[in-house]
Amino acid sequence: MSDLPELHWLHGKPTATGRLKSTPEDFKVSEDLGFTLDGEGEHVMVRVRKTGCNTAFVAEKLAKFAGIHPRDASYAGLKDRNAVTEQWFCLRMPGKEMPDFSQFTLEGCEILTTTRQQRKLRIGTLKGNHFTLVLRDISDVTSVETRLVEIQKQGVPNYFGVQRFGRNGDNLRQAWRWATNEIRVKERSKRSFYLSAARSAMFNHLVSQRLERHIYTQVLCGDAMQLHGKRSWFVAEGAELAQIQTRYEEHDIHITAPLPGKGDLGTQAQALIFETDNLADYEALWSLAQQERVDTTRRAINLLPENMSWHWLDDTTVSLSFFLPAGSFATSVVRELILLGNIDAENISE
């Protein structure tokens, strides 16, 4: 079970092939925190455009330039190295003057703006990311154009991307070994990576099973429904299923699946039976998450890209733009358009 399974597609397996990220400029990401910065406070906020640099490396260099410990530099999320990305970095500098960032030099990095903030910027503290991707050498333009229209209307499965599971799925493989007592994992960061891979794999499996059983867009009795744009959810009761189905089709609410851990899954009746039955093969991973006292959370199974648009640069090249909420993967959109090799997919950022 440690190898990454082939997940089902909402719009059918793509027939077209193509290339992503021929150059870093073919993959652009702009982070959106979703709130206005204070303009004052003990934290210096630095907006950086970077190419060919990973996030942690830039944070370390900014901390060194500012004369602070690396642990006092933070960011909201990791961005891909092999891309052009814009994001905020946060430097804790109480009582210190704003550094002269015009003197900061790092190949591939450009300081766009600086300000101050009262609170530390923590992982996950962002609204989402704006993506602009260029897909080249598309073998079946008609198919891709049709799929773009379908995705704009219906969305895509909200799968965790392959990068969530480590290079060649190694984090998931190690999670299985840990769960079956083949290895002991002491390092905190590895425990976190392996648990994340385990829970993401269970989520992906349940989403794929709903597609295979043709209940992906059908609200089941007992489904946990998430309000659009919110983290709160409620259970779909039998007497209200017709009304809830209508709200789902209007994208007002979303069907969810669990990232299993300790505590109840949150579903009831038919939906609970479906989830528990289909997690049977993942019992060891689920037990591991419970043992490590990770809370069960839920996530929408469908991802509807916002502000989606595209235009053809030439006969076989399309430029595609959209916004995704925090925690969603551009992989999920691209995999419904063209067949991607593992190397391409592993290099797509969250």
From Swiss-Prot:
This is tRNA pseudouridine synthase D. One of its GO terms (biological process) is tRNA pseudouridine synthesis. NCBIfam families: PRK00984.1-4, tRNA_TruD_broad. It catalyses: uridine(13) in tRNA = pseudouridine(13) in tRNA. Residues 155-303 form the TRUD domain. Pfam families: TruD. Keywords: Isomerase, tRNA processing. It comes from the Bacteria. One of its GO terms (cellular component) is cytosol. Its EC number is 5.4.99.27. The active site is at D80. The keyword Transmembrane does not apply. InterPro entries: PsdUridine_synth_cat_dom_sf, PsdUridine_synth_TruD, PsdUridine_synth_TruD_CS, PsdUridine_synth_TruD_insert, TruD_catalytic, TruD_insert_sf, TruD_pseudoU_synthase. Substrate binds at F27, N129, F329. It is an enzyme of class 5 (isomerase). Gene3D superfamilies: TruD, catalytic domain, TruD, insertion domain. It comes from Proteus mirabilis (strain HI4320). Belongs to the pseudouridine synthase TruD family. Responsible for synthesis of pseudouridine from uracil-13 in transfer RNAs. The gene is truD.
